[in-house]
């Protein structure tokens, strides 16, 4: 997978920006974690949830990756329903199909 796999046609500008930023994090691992999750939920996020997702996008890759993949404690201000959804989306018991 090289990035965005869905069309952004029909998405409002804010959702398009969020999707783009989720797929262009800086590290490939975080591109995959954030981008795939964003693709799955971008159309259903409320305004408030988009605010929370934007806050997560601002977190440095190393910190966010450690919270998602390495079980490091999540600061209270980032332990939101959107973060928990992102983490749950990537909790699995089989290899990820790249």
Regions found by a protein language model. Name each.
Residues 2-98:
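Positively charged, polar, low-complexity stretches
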């Amino acid at each position: 997978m090289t990035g965005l796999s869905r069309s952004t046609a029909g998405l409002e500008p804010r959702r398009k920006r969020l999707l783009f930023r989720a797929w262009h994090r800086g590290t490939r691992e975080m591109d995959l974690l954030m981008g795939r999750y964003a693709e799955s939920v971008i159309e259903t996020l409320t305004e408030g949830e988009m605010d929370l997702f934007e806050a997560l996008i601002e977190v440095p890759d190393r910190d966010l990756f450690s919270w998602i993949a390495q079980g490091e404690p999540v600061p209270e201000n980032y332990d939101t329903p959107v973060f928990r959804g992102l983490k749950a989306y990537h909790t699995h018991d089989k290899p990820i199909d790249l």
